[in-house]
Amino acid sequence: MDLNISTALRSFTQRYIDLWQQQTGHLPASKDLYGVPSPCIVATGEDQVFWQPQAFLPEATLTNIERALEIQLHPDIHDFYTQQYAGDMMADLGNHRFTLLQVWSEDDFIRLQENLIGHLVTQKRLKLSPTLFLATTSSEMTMASLCNVSGNVVLEQFGSDKRTLLASTLSHFLDALRPVLPE
């Protein structure tokens, strides 16, 4: 049975929070997001913020991208990026370590849309089938992305057609991820 994206994302996020609480005794923390406003922040430490996910309000979609590029985006990407505000979360899948990208605030949502447009424009210019990034890796040139045509999640090399299947659906990808703490 295929979980819907909202359920799969909530489940992964809860596993990530549980890991933080088991290993550190507190909610997820970020030094990188210190000083950046967000509805997720529940406490501020000396040089870090502690966060927990918040509902994405007001409701939103990525239709601005669709209008700007005259493209229909895979429905899973709308659900993935508009369910919650949260910090980025680290996870492993097989031999790969990912930083699952999340929306931190309304301003971050605008930035995300601009970056997705840039990504899609680059792919169109290079005559590559469209993908939408979901997670980064330690390499600036490799990322996990949703194939806009098939809905598969692939490991792709930026700017090339080199793609490796990671999961048949986004919900399967989220379900298979194993949360890890940042090093």
From Swiss-Prot:
Any one annotated GO CC term: cytoplasmic side of plasma membrane
Predominant subcellular localization, coarse grouping: membrane
Recorded superkingdom: Bacteria
Coiled coil: none
Compartments where found: Cell inner membrane
TM region(s), chain numbering: none
Keywords attached to this entry: Cell inner membrane, Cell membrane, Membrane
Annotated membrane topology: Peripheral membrane protein
Functional summary from the UniProt entry: Interacts with the SecY protein in vivo. May bind preferentially to an uncomplexed state of SecY, thus functioning either as a chelating agent for excess SecY in the cell or as a regulatory factor that negatively controls the translocase function.
NCBIfam families in alphabetical order: PRK04968.1 (NF003439)
Family: Belongs to the Syd family.
Protein name listed in UniProt: Protein Syd
